[in-house]
UniProtKB/Swiss-Prot annotation:
Cited function: Expression of the mnh2 operon in E.coli is not able to catalyze Na(+)Li(+)/H(+) antiport. It does however confer higher growth rates than the control strain at up to pH 9.5. The operon may encode an NADH-ubiquinone oxidoreductase.
Keyword list, A-Z: Antiport, Cell membrane, Ion transport, Membrane, Transmembrane, Transmembrane helix, Transport
Organism: Staphylococcus aureus
Protein family: Belongs to the CPA3 antiporters (TC 2.A.63) subunit D family.
Protein encoded by which gene: mnhD2
This protein's name: Putative antiporter subunit mnhD2
Amino acid sequence: MMLSNLLILPMLLPFLCALILVFLKNNDRISKYLYLGTMTITTIISLMLLIYVQRHRPITLDFGGWSAPFGIQFLGDSLSLIMVTTASFVITLIMAYGFGRGEHKANRYHLPSFILFLSVGVIGSFLTSDLFNLYVMFEIMLLASFVLITLGQSVEQLRAAIIYVVLNIIGSWLFLLGIGLLYKTVGTLNFSHIAMRLNDMGDNRTVTMISLIFLVAFSAKAALVLFMWLPKAYAVLNTELAALFAALMTKVGAYALIRFFTLLFDQHNDLIHPLLATMAAITMVIGAIGVIAYKDIKKIAAYQVIISIGFIILGLGTNTFAGINGAIFYLVNDIVVKTLLFFIIGSLVYITGYRQYQYLNGLAKKEPLFGVAFIIMIFAIGGVPPFSGFPGKVLIFQGALQNGNYIGLALMIITSLIAMYSLFRILFYMYFGDKDGEEVNFKKIPLYRKRILSILVVVVIAIGIAAPVVLNVTSDATELNTSDQLYQKLVNPHLKGED
């Protein structure tokens, strides 16, 4: 019972900290230590819960003494807790990275509070086992992210915010419509209860329509085909906010797609999974076009996010254990790698004052850390062993082969090479670039930011080396979410499909 109560802490601690920070906007030092300490503790608690779940069984927390399906339930299983742990870790580093960026101005806008409110929505989305509360968490994320995009009040930010909000509101409307139709059909909102009742119903046209509604809603959140909001939104954000959005916002949508189309709507595999694979292929191609079409390194980074979403959903679309396992592994890896990517890109813009790669003017010779970090990051994105992207991509390849999706497999290989090429092009100018012989006065990057970059580089290498440990977690997550009977037995054994 006591252990179950700990499940609320990864969401509760950032929420309480965000409220306290509102009243500490004039005290930078206390604010910094408070939010960094809060997210560090949140990461440690999440990791402890993950270790327990791996050694024993999933944890559930029923609020108010009301057991599922009637009450609100949080679920700590391998999938939710590895996502919470990874998200908490990168949020901690992102907030530490922004430590020295005009704190007085940031606190005047309550920037740390809104980052923490966004964290509440992200972590709550991973932990909830209830459909309506997932919607609530998505709306918390949407509200906080809208405020973060518009901070600074420039024309570019407001334009990007309008596109971002309109598309995400449409996604939210579809999500709410799907919830209403699903509740009318099955009479419950709890994940495990929904899974049981949908299995009892078998193939059903109404359920098929509902599953398609959820597919579109989550695709808008994940930037799966419906990516129009992403490049403009990410391009106007400062470094830490761009890293935050790239690491987490699309990943919550991808997580929802994985949870829904393995656990809930698995009886519609013949329709949904080929559609997912097709959408993934389109997304990869669009992302690949984007990374070679621009010289703006922030936009190149944004399209790298789109390509990676295509990789993840291709794994899900294979509808094989290997493919789904690879999708989850790559999802976790991509949170860390995209944080590193946007930290590096943001640092390059800060040092040179330019966003076009041809102005990098041999920067890596003067700042060798960025050259080394960039090379490691490229290999991780490309799936080169022994770096962190390799195990996930191998499993997705394996799943595509088992599924017979040779077109998706070929596109993944081609777009991976294009993604690496676009980054090697930046790297070339970092080492050898010379824009018309001009001298660029490089700014000095603060030492603490170099240390944070170094931490992320070490983690990227460690994930690749310790891949068997991570794969144990992702394999358990895959097994639980692809087996309705196992999920019911371990999560809500008291529920019956006909109740």
